Design a protein with these regions (language model features):
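Membrane-helix boundary connector in multi-pass membrane proteins
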Residues: 68, 72-73, 85-106
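Hydrophobic alpha-helical transmembrane segments
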Residues: 50-59, 63, 116-117
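Aromatic-anchored segments of alpha-helical transmembrane domains
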Residues: 20-29, 79-91
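Juxtamembrane helix-break-helix junctions at the cytosolic face
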Residues: 3, 57-73
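Non-cytosolic membrane-interface motifs at loop->transmembrane helix junctions
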Residues: 37-48, 97-111
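Cytosolic juxtamembrane helix and N-cap/initiation of the first transmembrane helix
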Residues: 1-21
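Membrane-water interface at the C-terminal end of transmembrane alpha helices
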Residues: 9-15, 113-137
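Hydrophobic transmembrane helix segments
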Residues: 15-46
Length: 137
């Protein structure tokens, strides 16, 4: 199983996916711990941080073991999460001139989501291209 992870780590697509996951994790954790988005109790902070870590770890672990045709769906799910949540919660505040604290990292979080959506499209096109490519003689 780890051989698949090592093999995928050589591809730029997996590296981009991992970097975007790290950006998303860092923003979500910063929102949780610094800006207290999930409440002020220690239990709420620890719980939210563990869920953030779990969200990133599941994506990083699943990507290499999924079939090439299914990977775009995983990447699109993470990208849509980042793009939509980041846009609604942070980018609108930046555009309105009301940005504070986590809105700046939230904008980077949104850009990571946009990168993942573009990566999902690229992976889907590659999967379709491989599917329709004629067999070599």
């Amino acid at each position: 199983m780890f051989a698949k992870h090592r093999r995928e780590l050589a591809t730029w697509e997996y590296k981009v996916f991992l970097v975007a996951l790290v950006v998303m994790f860092l923003h979500l954790t910063e929102d949780t711990l610094v800006h207290e988005e999930s409440g002020s109790s220690v239990g709420a902070k620890v719980g939210a941080t563990v869920l953030n870590l779990l969200l990133a770890a599941v994506g990083a672990a699943l990507y290499p073991v999924l079939r090439r045709r299914v990977r775009p769906l995983l990447v699109l799910a993470y990208g849509a999460l980042g793009l939509l949540a980041g846009w609604r919660a942070h980018v609108t505040d930046v555009l309105d001139g009301d940005a504070a604290g986590g809105d700046y990292t939230g904008t980077i979080f949104t850009l990571a989501g946009l990168v993942l959506v573009a990566l999902a499209v690229k992976l889907a096109v590659d999967a379709l291209r491989d599917r329709t490519a004629p067999a070599a003689p």
